A protein has these predicted regions:
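Short acidic/polar segment at the start of the alpha1 helix of CheY-like receiver
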Residues: 11-15
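Charged docking surfaces used in two-component/phosphorelay signaling
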Residues: 16-24
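Short hydrophobic/Thr-rich beta-strand motif most characteristic of the beta2 strand and flanking loop
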Residues: 26-33, 41
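Acidic catalytic/metal-coordinating carboxylates
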Residues: 33-37, 60-66
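Active-site residues of response regulator receiver
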Residues: 53
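Receiver (REC) domain active-site loop signature in two-component systems and cognate sites
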Residues: 56
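Alpha4 helix (beta4-alpha4-beta5 surface) of REC/receiver domains from two-component response regulators
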Residues: 60-63, 85-104, 110-118
Length: 127
């Protein structure tokens, strides 16, 4: 089974880098550029994992998270939040949920890969 991962970020350099990297790891990648598309595509495709920027047009990643939690199709999808700001500055915006993690930009791909491996089983992915 190929893992399906949704990436949400308004920076095309970030989405391109992550999409290429995850594609090389044999994941199927869906890319969106704002919080509205994030909620819409997550409900439509029901990915195994979402990687989202916290601050982007349409809705902050943390606001999109709240929308995802209200939808039975998406409420159990694990998320990795990304930001250029350190975790300490954003902790109060982020949910206290065992299915969420945080990674700071610029993204350390080895750390991201470890988080993906940790979270994919929570999203129903079976290798």
């Amino acid at each position: 089974m190929i893992a399906q991962i949704l990436i949400a970020d308004d920076n095309p350099d970030i989405t391109g880098l992550l999409s290429d990297y995850l594609g090389m790891k044999s994941h199927r990648v869906i890319v969106v550029n704002d919080g509205f598309q994030l909620s819409q595509k997550a409900s439509e495709h029901q990915p195994h994992l979402i990687i989202t920027d916290i601050q982007m047009p349409g809705a902050y990643g943390s606001s999109a998270y709240q929308v995802l939690q209200k939808d039975p199709k998406t409420k159990n999808i694990p998320l990795i939040f990304m930001s250029a700001h350190p975790y300490e500055k954003l902790a109060k915006l982020l949910p206290n949920d065992p299915k969420t993690r945080f990674v700071q930009k610029p993204v350390d791909l080895a750390k991201l890969e470890a988080l993906i491996k940790e979270l994919l089983p929570l999203g129903g992915y079976v290798p």
